[in-house]
Amino acid sequence: MNSEFQSLPPETQEAVKRTMDTMEPAQTPTEIRETLEGTQKGGVKNSIRNCLTVFQRDPLFRGALRLNLLTEQIDIVKPLGWERTSTTLTDMDMNYLLLYLEENYGLTSEKKVQSAIKIVANENRYHPVRDYLNSLQWDGTERIRYALHHFLGADTDEYTYEALKLFLMGAIRRVFRPGSKFEVMLCLVGGQGAGKSTFFRLLAGKDEWFSDDLKKLDDENVYRKLQGHWIIEMSEMIATANAKSIEEIKSFLSRQKETYKVPYETHPADRLRQCVFGGTTNRQDFLPRDRTGNRRFLPVTVYPERAEVHILDDEAAARAYIEQMWAEAMTVYRSGKYKLSFSMEMNRYLNAHQQDFMQEDTQAGMIYAYLEDYIGDRVCSKQLYEEALGNLNSPADWETRAICEIMNTGIAGGIIQGWVAYKSPKRYKKYGSQKGWERVNQAPPEGDGFQEITEEEARQMELPF
């Protein structure tokens, strides 16, 4: 193996060696040409089979073409004799391949060559992140529990540990079982220069497996931002801030696949998600107001002044630490003793913890205050829109839904007491027939409501018996 091969990642070198060991003995171009199917005129037939035979037997190509299951592109994983700047098969690589096949085998059909390349690459598929994770050996030292404090000064409480552990397990699961349901985003909150983005970049293992280019969730080419990446940072939570609604954010994070057709493909295909999303922000109130719950977001505040080391003080040491953290996570993954969700107790903590990061819900507060002073026995959404929120115009549908959400979640959560929704519309003098909410009859006190008094108390009150 030459120096170019030695420069490849160790896990890729091993994969190439395993592939080559399972192949037939190498032959010279002259020997291979004698085995190819010919034409009636004595030439070499331009067929997919002949091209495939060359790619499988020629020592230059053996083990060189592999389908990368992360990027879904074909990689050239060993030197082929010309200068290259990337691993991925390019148009220039195709030119060199066509030239070689023409000069050595008389194969000149570009279409047949391309088909053969796809077949041989698919038969030699590999997944670089899986190879990387499987190659790690844990040294037995616990790091997941302390990593966010070590690099970013975060707390060392159980929540911080469980949040990072859940994120790591989701990332591993998405790689080994693409499309797995995982809709959680670890969100690092703190000032500029704390190392939040660097943490996610180094967490990806290799820079090419990381991306921070996701700016809009409704971009028609959003799949291009996801393809080929494992850890995707939503920098400053720009993508969620640009979302049209909380429902769009929830839908995006919950998605398990993208369906699209890449250039040169005839049919669209389902691309199962292999990535996870991390968020960074310096805003304390970054969480979108969602009265039905924000369980998808796991905020962790960082305090760089408390960190044991800054993550960029020694990048090599930081990468080594994180690599061992992945090795620890792989030990947990292999044991099967993990869940891709919080316990009920941790979810209760999360719900309370998230309040510190939510935008103020002024509308809910105004409605709560209105109900405290209201003496009527029923209300409807239009009434609340006008009288509680002070609007003079008619509410849009989405505004009505927002009011219903405030009322129903407030009642369910115990914030609004003494009210219940009624099913059949009731008529309001000012608002017409409307669904809404009515007061619940207060439970009478125990007994008959009377209190026994003594004869002396009765005489004092001049009550005859």
Spans of features found by a protein language model:
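Conserved nucleotide-binding/hydrolysis micro-motifs of P-loop NTPases
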Residues: 238-239, 282-286, 303-308
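P-loop NTPase catalytic core of nucleic-acid-dependent motor ATPases
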Residues: 117-227, 231, 382
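Phosphate-sensing "switch" segment of ASCE/P-loop ATPases
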Residues: 271-275, 290-369, 373
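AAA+/SF3 P-loop NTPase mechanochemical coupling elements
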Residues: 222-227, 262-280
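Positively charged interface segments
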Residues: 217, 265, 291, 304-320, ...
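N-terminal nucleic-acid engagement/recognition segments and initiation subdomains in replication
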Residues: 1-142, 158, 162, 393-398, ...
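Conserved catalytic/switch belt of AAA+ P-loop NTPases
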Residues: 246-269
